[in-house]
């Protein structure tokens, strides 16, 4: 029997699956389908949009499993997630099953509409239910993970992907008013099972990994009593084992860290931070949920960490991780999330949030990422009763706060993290144009506007020239002055760039400096590679 996996992408508090990130779900499902003797083929929603003929082919498939759900919406460069509107036209195969966090937000009316177009909805979390719905009897998610690794070779961007790896599921806190992680029971994968999946993916050609599918990386392998105590020795062995099995990994990063774990267990957390700096790759980010710096909002929404605990976690990660490394980025930095529209929020909340960020700046601490989003209301969460009334009430304050942060915090912070002239390595071009857009394959990579037309999937090293609010503009490193375009020279040197262009070939560094000044030697080479 023929089955299609249609990846409409997911973005959850503890899982990212929008290109270049590949969530565990397609891999689990592929392994599951193989165990049930299906001949499975993987498609991204972007591929189906671009290839109508493939959509026609799907009508001959026996089964389609559609994955979708953006629980924490963001802006995406690498792909456009499946929308609800598109979903109703996804009943393509003989039998169609919908899985993923999108099922948490479907109304009764939408469920009936899906039934009308013959799309079966499987409740989230879905893996065991899907397997049983397809007639399976011996459910083993770890076995499916390793067996399904080979599906990544069918990804349109392979090998330019980063695989999201699940270490455990659920949240030891599980009380935040808005969060969907409460739907998961705590379930832990053994180091051996995680390593087996990483090795299977590595053997398929994957070189970029994010240990991101958990709510708190620091508590993996820890003692789960109260606030989990990290186990730095076990984590060090785990990291060593990854490199022993997969010595040519290019990216090894994490995602979520609960700042409460760090604040409650500072000594163990410090040792784990050192392990991450030593055994993971630079440019790493620990995304932490501050959500609000207003103590009233913290209490009313049962948030995990106080502003003081978050500030402590930011400082501790900075202490060991802020130093720049070989790829141009600091080894390991914190990031923080703000959620707007929570219970108890007032106009003063926005001032408290901003004051928190000002204190970070005053203490000369680095934040790699400040994520500001409006709360998304899910049925079954405490925020369901509250609704979106504060979002509507504080719309102006939200926009003003976001703009203020982008202007006064993000840009100065970016200048500290990536000073002018800093070389950034291994930038993958994702969008080609007069300004080509490129990023490292990493967790929360910085967007780089690369001056010049470069083909998609080319890897380029570049030097920082200028700044946006959350991005930098750069030119190719070691750019040969005699091969550079007029646009590149004018961008670097202004009006003098045209003079340099007209007087080519330039014969020496001294001649280049005489025309363009000392700064020209930072970015341009004479006869450079």
Curated annotation (Swiss-Prot):
It comes from Archaeoglobus fulgidus (strain ATCC 49558 / DSM 4304 / JCM 9628 / NBRC 100126 / VC-16). This is Uncharacterized protein AF_0243. Its cofactor is [4Fe-4S] cluster. [4Fe-4S] cluster binds at residues 171, 176, 179. It comes from the Archaea. Keywords: 4Fe-4S, Iron, Iron-sulfur, Metal-binding, S-adenosyl-L-methionine. The lineage of its organism: Archaea, Methanobacteriati, Methanobacteriota, Archaeoglobi, Archaeoglobales. CDD domains: Radical_SAM. The keyword Glycoprotein does not apply. Residues 157-410 form the Radical SAM core domain.
């Amino acid at each position: 029997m023929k089955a299609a996996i249609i990846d409409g992408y997911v973005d959850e508090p503890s899982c990212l699956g929008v290109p270049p990130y590949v969530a565990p779900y397609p891999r689990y499902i592929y392994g599951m389908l193989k165990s049930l003797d299906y001949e499975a083929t993987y498609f991204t929603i972007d591929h189906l949009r671009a290839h109508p003929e493939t959509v026609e082919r799907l009508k001959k498939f026996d089964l389609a499993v559609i994955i979708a759900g953006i629980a924490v919406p963001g802006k995406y460069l690498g792909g456009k997630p499946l929308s609800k509107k598109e979903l109703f036209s996804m009943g393509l195969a003989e039998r169609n099953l919908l899985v993923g966090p999108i099922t948490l937000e479907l109304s009764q009316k939408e469920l009936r509409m899906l039934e009308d177009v013959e799309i079966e909805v499987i409740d989230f979390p879905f893996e065991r239910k899907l397997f049983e719905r397809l007639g399976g009897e011996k459910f083993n998610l770890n076995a499916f993970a390793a067996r399904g690794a080979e599906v990544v070779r069918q990804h349109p961007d392979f090998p330019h992907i980063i695989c999201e790896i699940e270490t455990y599921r659920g949240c030891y806190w599980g009380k935040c008013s808005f969060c969907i992680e409460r739907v998961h029971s705590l379930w832990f994968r053994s180091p051996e099972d995680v390593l087996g999946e990483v090795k299977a993916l590595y053997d398929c050609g994957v070189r970029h990994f994010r240990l991101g599918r958990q709510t708190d990386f620091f508590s993996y392998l820890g003692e789960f009593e109260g606030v989990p105590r990290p186990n730095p020795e076990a984590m060090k062995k785990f990291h060593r084992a990854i490199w022993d099995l997969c010595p040519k990994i290019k990216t090894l990063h994490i995602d979520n860290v609960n700042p409460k774990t760090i604040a409650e267990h500072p000594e163990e957390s410090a040792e784990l931070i050192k392990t991450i700096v030593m055994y993971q790759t630079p440019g790493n980010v620990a995304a932490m949920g501050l959500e609000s710096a207003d103590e009233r909002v913290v209490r009313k929404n049962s948030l995990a960490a106080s502003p003081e605990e978050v500030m402590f976690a930011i400082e501790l990660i900075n202490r060991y991780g802020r130093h720049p490394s070989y790829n141009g980025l600091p080894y390991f930095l914190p990031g923080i999330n703000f959620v707007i529209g929570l219970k108890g929020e007032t106009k003063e909340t926005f001032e408290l949030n901003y004051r928190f960020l000002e204190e970070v700046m005053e203490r000369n601490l680095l934040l790699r990422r400040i994520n500001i989003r409006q709360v998304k209301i899910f049925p079954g969460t405490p925020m369901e009763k509250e609704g979106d009334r504060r979002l509507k009430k504080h719309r102006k304050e939200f926009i003003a706060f976001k703009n203020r942060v982008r202007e006064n915090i993000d840009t100065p912070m970016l200048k500290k993290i990536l000073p002018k002239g800093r070389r950034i390595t291994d930038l993958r071009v994702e969008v080609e144009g007069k300004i080509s857009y490129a990023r490292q394959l990493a967790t929360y990579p910085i967007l780089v506007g690369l001056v010049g037309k470069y083909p998609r999937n080319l890897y380029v090293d570049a030097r920082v020239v200028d700044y946006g609010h959350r991005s930098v503009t750069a030119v190719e490193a070691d750019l040969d002055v005699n091969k550079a375009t007029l646009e590149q020279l004018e961008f670097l040197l202004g009006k003098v760039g045209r003079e340099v262009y007209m007087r080519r070939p330039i014969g020496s560094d001294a001649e280049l400096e005489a025309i363009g000044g000392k700064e020209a030697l930072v970015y341009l080479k004479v006869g450079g590679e």
